[in-house]
Amino acid sequence: MRICWYNDNRLGLVKGDRVYDVSKALEKLPKPTYPAARNGDPLIVHLAKLRPDIEAAATGSGTPIGDVKFLSPVAAPSKVIGTPTNYADHIAEADKQRDVFTMKRPSANIDDQGLFLKANSCLIGAGEVVKLRFPQRRTDHEMELGVIIGKPAEH
């Protein structure tokens, strides 16, 4: 089962080259509480229970996949963790620009680099545009891979 968030925060089920609006299945989610539970995105947490409702809601002709705007795949991540130089080419690039990088000595060792937190609102979907708030400042592009730690994943 391939699910997605698309257009105006609609939950979709992708089948072949079409996306089916299965947002009705979200009605089965438990009501939010305060303080909010800290166990992650409610859809992901309750996915096993919602799966039959998601599959049953995939009716009609769907929307061609090319006509939807995909949003971030996780609507409510609990946290996003990063590391400054996370692959060999970036470490080599940083080593050539020591005046720019605060450590002055890029290292492949994670203990030297440390980790940092990003806002959980920093995620975007495929094809979405990153808006630079201060375009006159130096901005380094980053391409990231998200990993869910803690549960076996399926596609």
PLM feature spans:
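Metabolite-binding pocket within alpha/beta catalytic cores that recognizes anionic/polar moieties
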Residues: 116
